[in-house]
Amino acid sequence: MSKLDLNALNELPKVDRILALAETNAELEKLDAEGRVAWALDNLPGEYVLSSSFGIQAAVSLHLVNQIRPDIPVILTDTGYLFPETYRFIDELTDKLKLNLKVYRATESAAWQEARYGKLWEQGVEGIEKYNDINKVEPMNRALKELNAQTWFAGLRREQSGSRANLPVLAIQRGVFKVLPIIDWDNRTIYQYLQKHGLKYHPLWDEGYLSVGDTHTTRKWEPGMAEEETRFFGLKRECGLHEG
């Protein structure tokens, strides 16, 4: 696999970009997660960043990437509505893994947003999407720009939802390379990695949560529910960061 030209690929239509990356993705599928990270660091341009929501399995990708690339900027988009357990988990992992945490927030405070727009998350899909644009998408775009990112690592997995089932290891999103080292991992592999390295699930895992985001749009899992139904009232799975 040879080095890739981000500028040249960005000039192609989306379908042509996917085709141009197909051969590389076929080879990346053969590598393990550590090998994918190492390949990306050797062959894709910097600056490098890692994003995390500090959700249920967050410790895996944070540990995996940070041990290979210590001090990599870790981007968190903080909505102001995370669970108290999430904020404590962020502090715990940042200290334990010595993370170079970079927190980005909306330009409007949560209280100001509610005063202007009401509770957007109660206003159907359109309201949720506006909320996500303000609190997730814009802060992430700002983070990528300010950190001069050209290669973005994330911890998505195909098993998590139908919307992620066909994602490749390597893609281009928001004008930068996006690498998903653990995209093909199942829940058992996640558990084994956590056990091997003395890491923990998010604290709410033990209370029946399969996925954790904001307090107002996250539900405990109940028998018969798909994982994606525990977020955004089942109306959508993605918060906007990993779409487009």
UniProtKB/Swiss-Prot annotation:
Record organism: Escherichia coli (strain K12)
Enzyme class: oxidoreductase
HAMAP family according to UniProt: CysH
Primary localization class, coarse: cytoplasm
UniProt key word Cytoplasm: yes
InterPro entries the UniProt entry points to: PAPS/APS_Rdtase (IPR004511), PAPS_reduct_dom (IPR002500), PAPS_reductase_CysH (IPR011800), Rossmann-like_a/b/a_fold (IPR014729)
Gene Ontology molecular functions: phosphoadenylyl-sulfate reductase (thioredoxin) activity
Active site: C239
Pathway assigned in UniProt: Sulfur metabolism; hydrogen sulfide biosynthesis; sulfite from sulfate: step 3/3
Protein name: Phosphoadenosine 5'-phosphosulfate reductase
Activity-regulation annotation: Severely inhibited by reagents which covalently modify Cys groups in proteins.
